[in-house]
Amino acid sequence: MSKVLSSGSTIGILGGGQLGQMLSMAAARLGFKTHIFEPSANPPASNVSSGFTQAEYDDYDKLKKFASSVDVVTYEFENIPTGALDIIEKECEIFPSREALKISQDRLLEKKFINKLGFKTASFCEVSSQEGLIFALENLGTPSILKTRRFGYDGKGQVKLGATSNPKEIWESLGEKELILEGFVDFSHEISVIGSRSKDGQISCFDPGENVHKDGILRTTTVPANLTTQQKTDAVLITAKILESLNYIGVIGVEFFVANSTLIINEFAPRVHNSGHWTQNGCTVDQFEQHIRAIAGWNLGNGERHCDVIMENLIGDQINKTNDLIADGSVSLHLYGKVDIKPGRKMGHFNRIIK
């Protein structure tokens, strides 16, 4: 039986980016220590953790030592090699579960899983060859979106296809990998629900947020989202069903398209989520604390929203707006401490309370 952790226990986190950083800060508020495992030097999370191991995920000796030094392991990103998980599981528990990771790592498995639960996704075809791409295009038509099945995030690993697209060139440009072709969804807007489930099966969902993306990267999340009461209820119930079906422990982010009043699931992420950052200033207990509570075996906290919020990411050189934001007393600023400013890189975010 999974144990309940007491304050003073150590939580291991795979990945040292901003999500790991904010998980560490939430853990510290509850009296936990954290230990970060991350390949890169000086990641954001290392500045707020009590332990840091810099090593690759195929360094099994370092992984074993890391796992044996903590009481539970969680992660800030989903593309973790299977071999690393094998090593860790011999030493301690991992939350969320490997089943959730397995499904979320593969867009084809993810779509099939969602459809099996009875929920809608974009239409799709598996593509494993140039000929398969031609067949898929004949079935789904254009416009459509061709994506790698694995390792895609923030708009990477995908390309929009039109009537004049050359299947041979497109197939080669994506590295001749296993792909999935998704039919185009004509949606009015995008939303997401951040849900959580505890070890004893308690489920709590934050209010849906309305998301705006540019170049495949989340720019803003506004809460409350533009939804009918029924749509809001449906989005939360769908998220709860996914949590239950996976016997999930921790926080999950489920993204939806709203198309002709219909909710179509885009994808889910088995971790804390960028579109949930608004909870840091809009709720008593935010997504990061909720995740720590869940994996520690604690009861979930009160995630009820107490104000309307707009969250905006600071991307690339938008970090240069920092001085103006510091002078603006109406915003709560969250900076990640990243040194290198790169196009498309998330450098921080801010929450503006609008009511």
Describe the function of each predicted region.
Residues I103-S192, S196-I242, K355:
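Active-site nucleotide/adenylate-binding loops and adjacent lid/helix of ATP-dependent enzymes
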Residues F32, S50, C92-E93, F119-A122, ...:
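A structural micro-motif
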Residues S173-L227, K232-I265, A269-H277, E289-N302, ...:
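Phosphate-binding core of ATP-grasp and ATP-grasp-like enzymes
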Residues M1-L109, E131:
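ATP-binding N-terminal substructure of ATP-dependent carboxylate-amine bond-forming enzymes
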Residues Q280-N281:
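A conserved FAD-binding loop/helix module that cradles the flavin
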Residues R305-L314:
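Short glycine-/aliphatic-rich beta-strand segments at the starts of folded cytosolic domains
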Residues N313, Q318-K321:
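Extracellular/lumenal mucin-like low-complexity stalks
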Residues I341-I354:
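An anion-binding loop in the catalytic cleft
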